[in-house]
Amino acid sequence: MVCVLLASLTSCMKIGMKQNAIESRLKESGATISYERTTPITKEAKGYVFEDLIRSTKVYTRTVDGQESEVTEELFIIFCGNDATADWTENACKTYLADNKSDSDKWISYRYDRIVMCGYYELLSIARNY
């Protein structure tokens, strides 16, 4: 029993440290962080366990046909409470991207353990630290 509790605690600590590192990297890059109750990806979830749902946004300046414009890009970071929730969320991200985004939007999804990210590739790269 002690081993199970220790393993659970270690897992929670790793996720917590990972969450702090992700938030720090995004903030250092000029992105904003907000905690959400739901996301476009998780709004249909029933019976799944989510710990934190984070929406990160950052304004990018783009030049199209000589005109500069500001575009706000976003990244959703979903901390799942168990493997079944992470599996469901990973599939929900893929479905969301297929239904709502095109290749030109440059949105991707990524999963690490029980953390699932879905959003603009540059923000996701910052969050993943590469």
Named regions from a protein language model:
Residues M1-C3:
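Sec-dependent N-terminal signal peptides
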Residues S8-S11:
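C-terminal motif of bacterial Sec signal peptides marking the signal peptidase cleavage site
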Residues M13-I15:
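Bacterial signal peptide processing site
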Residues M17, A21, R25, W88, ...:
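Extracytoplasmic/secreted proteins, especially bacterial periplasmic and envelope-associated proteins
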Residues R25-S102:
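Short, solvent-exposed recognition patches
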Residues L97-Y130:
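A short, solvent-exposed beta-edge/loop patch
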